[in-house]
């Protein structure tokens, strides 16, 4: 016996079998489909180079077959996509079965007759991923013609692009919309004339992006770095919308801006500054006052309110259909279970936009909540999203899942950093942010201001000059009350408009990776 040769042959055979009967010197392959596939797909051929192999008829009938040629038709009809999946080599039922059984971790699919279908490097794997991402069930696939939301168009175009093993047919409406989304800078939309000389090049591109989303019926996230002028880009869109409504090209409707309370009046000032022809309405005051303001607002006006007030007034807003709804500092709805998040999602609007200065792709639960506001269902239910996308990415660092998620969301997020647009920026960007006193802080300021006026009214000229230091002291107290009443009153625990706004700016800046240098005449703040 040639023991060395026997050992060599044994080592060649062993990888294809999972049991070895020592007493009978027999290898056994038992209950292991993966090893059976390896044996049938290439193992027998390799072993046959060294030995004579005898098989039963049943075993000889096991085959490894190639994937069928599949054609995919995509049509845009109104606001829906029609998807047709077809193969001349098998029935719809068989094709649906294959797609439902696809597992990207495997190299094959076991057919009902026992044969193996090779799915390595073929169009079927791409189609199966699309089927999974679109949540197409085997029952859906058996129909042959599928209806999916229009917002899947860019994903489908990217997922099926350049796949030589799939035959893709697209109707002209679908190709036209995709072309518009991909060539935004070449679009025919025009920046409003009054703003054209004010806006920087990247801001004009931002307007074109917003306008393209608006006209195609998609929502979006404008996530430019802090200081790059997201507000001005939104104002340009609101201006264009108003011009089209006045020209009769669009139905006359209100728009709605929702932001932190500290930014409500800042939004009004910025709109008045850049587009004074736009009519803004602040929704504030008591519950009856706010309801009256909303109900008596006119079509074409821009309502501005805070997250806190909107969640209380959501029922009143639900009676209207808005042209544009903007949520500023969109991280306010990062927790979908909060009343603020539920409130903004109850509003009906033709176009929904979210603004944020911080990157959101790495905070997946926040990303889901924002897209649930923009285009409900786009990222499925949160339970499905968490199980199938968030946890695999966060826990297992699943690169394939991350790439597929990016492919879905990429067309609907625009983020430019300062480093990306340096040539368009001045040496220094200055921005004035206005804080409006309210509530207890305003009452304290009014009380101290009234007391000072009474004191001054009772002084003659001589007393006035003699008491100048006291007057300066009283003026300092008023300034302290404006900054934060806690500077003057140790037991004050109420709100401070300027401190609250300052903290929001700091939190957002730090969240975007910026460093902060803070100056104040009252360092005890």
Briefly describe each language-model feature range.
Residues 165-398, 404-525:
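ASCE P-loop NTPase motor core, strongest for the SF2 helicase catalytic module
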């Amino acid at each position: 016996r040639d023991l060395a040769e026997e050992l060599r042959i044994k080592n060649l055979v062993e990888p294809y079998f999972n049991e070895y009967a020592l007493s009978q010197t027999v290898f056994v392959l038992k209950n292991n489909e993966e090893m059976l596939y390896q044996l049938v797909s290439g193992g027998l051929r390799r072993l046959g180079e060294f030995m004579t192999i005898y098989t039963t008829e049943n075993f000889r009938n096991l085959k490894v077959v190639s994937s069928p040629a599949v054609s995919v038709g995509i049509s845009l009809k109104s606001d829906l996509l029609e998807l047709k999946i077809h193969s001349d080599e098998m029935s719809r039922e068989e094709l649906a079965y294959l797609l439902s059984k696809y597992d990207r971790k495997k190299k094959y699919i076991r057919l009902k007759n026992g044969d193996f279908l090779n799915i390595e490097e073929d169009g079927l794997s791409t189609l199966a991923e699309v089927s999974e991402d679109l949540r197409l069930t085997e029952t859906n696939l058996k129909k042959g013609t599928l209806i999916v939301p229009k917002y899947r168009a860019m994903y489908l175009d990217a997922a099926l692009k350049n796949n030589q093993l799939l035959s893709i047919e697209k109707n002209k409406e679908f190709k036209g919309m995709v072309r518009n989304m991909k060539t935004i800078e070449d679009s025919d939309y025009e920046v409003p004339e009054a703003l054209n000389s004010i806006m920087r090049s990247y801001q004009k591109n931002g307007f074109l992006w917003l306008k393209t989303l608006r006209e195609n019926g998609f929502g979006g996230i404008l996530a430019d770095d802090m200081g790059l002028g997201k507000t001005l880009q939104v104002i340009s869109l609101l201006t264009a919308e108003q011009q089209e409504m006045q020209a009769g090209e669009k139905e006359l409707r209100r728009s709605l801006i929702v932001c932190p309370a500290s930014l409500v009046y800042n939004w009004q000032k910025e709109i008045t500054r850049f587009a004074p022809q736009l009519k803004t309405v602040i929704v504030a005051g008591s519950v009856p006052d706010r309801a009256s303001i909303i109900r008596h607002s006119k079509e074409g006006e821009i309502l501005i309110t805070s997250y806190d007030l909107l969640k209380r007034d959501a029922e009143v807003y639900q009676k209207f259909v808005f042209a544009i709804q903007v949520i500023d500092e969109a991280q306010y709805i990062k927790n979908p279970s909060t009343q603020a998040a539920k409130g903004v999602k109850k509003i009906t609007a033709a176009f929904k936009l979210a603004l944020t200065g911080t990157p959101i792709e790495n905070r997946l639960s926040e990303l889901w909540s924002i897209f649930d506001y923009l285009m409900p269902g786009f990222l499925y239910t949160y339970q499905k999203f968490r199980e199938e996308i968030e946890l695999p990415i966060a826990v297992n660092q699943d690169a394939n899942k991350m790439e597929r998620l990016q492919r879905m969301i990429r067309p609907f997020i625009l983020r430019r950093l300062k480093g990306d647009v340096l040539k368009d920026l001045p040496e220094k960007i200055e921005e004035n942010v206005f804080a409006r006193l309210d509530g207890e802080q305003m009452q304290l300021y009014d009380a101290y201001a009234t007391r000072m006026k009474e004191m001054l009214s009772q002084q003659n000229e001589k007393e006035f000059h003699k008491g100048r230091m006291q007057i300066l002291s009283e003026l300092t107290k008023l300034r302290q009350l404006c900054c934060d009443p806690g500077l003057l009153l140790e037991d004050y625990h109420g709100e401070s408009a300027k401190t609250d706004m300052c903290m929001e700016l700091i939190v957002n800046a730090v969240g975007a990776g910026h460093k902060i240098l803070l100056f104040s005449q009252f360092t005890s703040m």
